[in-house]
Amino acid sequence: MTMRLESKVAAVTGGGAGIGEAICHRLAAEGARVAALDISLPAARQVIKAIGDGLAAEVDVSDSAAVDAAIACVEREMGPVDILVNNAGAVGLDHVRRVSPLLERQRAEMAAGKVQTPLDALVRLSDEEWRYLMAVHLDGTFYCTRAAVRSMSWRGTGVIVNMASICGLEGCTGHPHYSAAKAGILGFTRSAAKELIVQGIRVNAVAPGFVDTSRLKGTLDAGRQAIAARTPAGRLGTPAEIAATVAFLASDDAAYFVGATLSPNGGLVTAV
C-alpha cells in the first residue's frame, strides 16, 4: 500500500459502518490520521479501535451546530482537517420496506409480460421522509463542507470528497427523495469546486452503483440478485472498491480533478 496520504488529517462522516468504515481503513492504510464521525459513537469507536489510532466523535450531520462542534473537536485533537469525506447518509428504511413488496409484485408481472402494479412511491412519500433525507444528505454535506472550509481556506489547501450515487445521475425507481438528494450533492459539488479551487481546495464526488453493505443485505435481500443480474459486471460493488476511489481523489494523484464525478458502478451507468 502506498503512503500517498501520510500525516494528512482526514475526517470521514458516516465513518462507523459500511462504506464509511472502509474509507476510514483505506485512508489510514495510506498514512492518514483518521477521525471517524458518526451518529453512533460506539460504532465510530469500534472503527478507530480496529485501525489502532485516530479519533472517534459523535455527530448528527443534519445539525449545523453539532457539525461545527465535531469539526472543532477534530482540529483541537488532531490539527486542521486536510481531507473531508462527506459520506454520511440514509436511505429511508421505512420507505424501502413499504415499497419492496410492490417491487416484488412488479417483477412477477414483468415475467408474465404485463405490469399492473404501480409503485406509487412518490405519492406514498411523507413530508417527514422527504425532509429527513434532504437534511442528512444535502444539509449535512453543506454544513460539513462549510465547517471544514473555514480552516482550509486560510491555509490554501484541502480536499473534499462528496458521496453521491448513480441514483443522483439517472434516478432510482421507488426512491425519488434519495435520488433528488444525491443529485443535489452533485450540483453542490460542481458549484463548490469552481468556487474553492482558487483557494487551493479541490472538491469532487463519487457516485457508486449498488454496493454490498449490511444495509442492503438487511432491506433488499430479494432485490440484490436482480440488481446483480442487470449489472454488466454481474455483481454488486464492495465497500473497499468505493474506498479506493475516495483515496485516489483525496491524494495528489488526482490534483487535476476539480468538480469531477467518478462512478464505480459495474457498468450500470457508462456516461458521467
What residues fall within each predicted segment?
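Residue(s) in the substrate-gating loop at a strand-loop-helix junction
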Residues: S165
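Short, small/polar-rich loop/turn modules that mediate ligand/substrate recognition or access, typified
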Residues: I197, R202, F257-G259
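The beta1-alpha1 cofactor-binding region of Rossmann-like NAD(H)/NADP(H)-dependent oxidoreductases
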Residues: L41-P42, V59-I71, A90, D127, ...
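Canonical Rossmann dinucleotide-binding motif of NAD(H)/NADP(H)-dependent dehydrogenases/reductases
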Residues: M3-A35, A192
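Catalytic Tyr-X3-Lys loop
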Residues: A90, P101-F142, T157, V161, ...
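Short C-terminal tail/terminal secondary-structure segment
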Residues: T2, G89-V91, E170, A247, ...
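Active-site helix of classical SDR
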Residues: T145, A181, T189
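Alpha-helical segment proximal to the catalytic Tyr-Lys
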Residues: R150, K194-E195, A255
